[in-house]
């Protein structure tokens, strides 16, 4: 299975000027309830970047621009292997409407460990924390 994961790095700031990251709580399947960065599967003929844009529009009714690749994560779950390309992304327009997720949060670097991440996302969380101001 090829997966595309995008990380929304929104440049909204708090009073302190901290960058914040958008995370969602999975609302379906065996991994329901775990926290992840929104994204989804690549369809035949799609690039990872195009898949991210499509998935975010479908799942969150939001248009994004896809930026730099953070990393490609390989993870073996008990029933499948996940390969996911992780990108920095920014919102172009939309209000991040939750269509498939149970909940969502904007997280600062300090709050990244406040949710229970899905196993495949834990590695990328560390890389994101290193990159944030």
Regions found by a protein language model. Give the residues of each.
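Active-site-adjacent beta-strand/loop module that shapes the phosphate/pyrophosphate-binding cleft
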Residues: 10, 63-65, 72-95, 103-105, ...
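Conserved N-terminal beta-strand and adjoining loop/helix that marks the start
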Residues: 1-21
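Nudix hydrolase/Nudix homology domain
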Residues: 30, 97-133
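A generic structural signal for short beta-strands and their flanking turns/coil linkers
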Residues: 20, 31-33, 38, 62-65, ...
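Structural detector for helix-capping/boundary residues
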Residues: 40, 54-55, 67, 102, ...
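Conserved Nudix-box catalytic region and its N-terminal flanking loop in Nudix hydrolases
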Residues: 19-58
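Hydrophobic packing within well-folded, soluble alpha/beta domains
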Residues: 48, 52-57, 69, 87, ...
